[in-house]
Regions:
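C-terminal structural segments of small proteins and small subunits
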Residues: 4, 10, 42, 46-76
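Short alpha-helix capping/helix-loop boundary micro-motifs
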Residues: 23-27
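Helix-centric, low-specificity signal for extended rod-like, repetitive segments
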Residues: 20-22, 36, 49
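Conserved beta-strand/loop element in small beta-rich adapter and peptidoglycan-binding domains
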Residues: 33-39
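Short, basic/aromatic beta-hairpin or loop at an interaction surface
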Residues: 6-20
Length: 76
């Protein structure tokens, strides 16, 4: 698994794990970052824009580094 912040623009992945302080983990899970959720990097920068469940969400890259994803090339 790799941090979500390392995905390239247009690349997709599936959430595998969310790390960090319990409040951050809870907030991200409420937004849909649960195991198996499909995510897409739409824009890198400040903020990063992520596609998740038909929505576009903006995050600091530091927060996205705590979301670990599986990318298709890694799925085996």
């Amino acid at each position: 698994m790799v941090p979500l912040s390392l995905l390239r623009v247009g690349e997709t992945g599936c959430v595998g794990e969310v790390l960090g302080h319990v409040d951050l983990v809870h907030r991200l899970r409420e937004m849909g970052f649960y195991d198996g959720a499909k995510v897409k990097m739409i824009r890198k920068g400040s903020p990063c824009i992520i596609g998740l469940a038909g929505q576009r969400l903006g995050f600091r890259c530091d927060d996205l580094a705590r979301v670990l994803v599986r990318i298709p090339a890694m799925a085996s």
